[in-house]
Regions:
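Intrinsic-disorder/low-complexity linker and hinge segments
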Residues: 1-4
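Basic/polar phosphate-binding segments, predominantly the helix-turn-helix DNA-binding elements
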Residues: 9, 13-15, 21-57, 71, ...
């Protein structure tokens, strides 16, 4: 039960802070765990790494903004925690199978 509460706590932390430049240290500190233990804990509970989960949340928010605003891809990338446009495009393509530009046009 404690593990589920810890997972909920870190998922809430990510949900409220995904747009910030979060580090593994910050995520693990939010549930008072060492980074190494936190990675193992998070992966066991969610079947993905903490950073994969964080990037997935960021990409989902970016998708929503791409389809509901006229903001530029660069603005959306930065607003969702990506401080490198090329990394955002690569990550977006990894999760969605297309570039943000193509997604916005579809």
């Amino acid at each position: 039960y404690k593990r589920i509460l810890q997972l909920k706590q870190v998922l809430d932390f990510i949900e409220h802070n995904y747009a910030s430049p979060l580090t593994l240290q910050q995520l693990s500190s939010s549930v008072s765990m060492s980074p190494k233990y936190f990675c193992r804990f998070f992966s066991e509970m969610t079947h993905q790494t903490p950073m994969d989960y964080l990037n997935h949340q960021r990409i989902e928010q970016a998708c929503y903004q791409l389809s509901t605003t006229d903001d530029s891809i660069t603005e959306i990338a930065y607003r969702n925690g990506f401080n490198d446009l090329s990394y955002f495009i690569r990550t977006f393509k990894k999760y969605k199978g297309m570039t943000p530009g193509k997604y916005k046009r579809s």
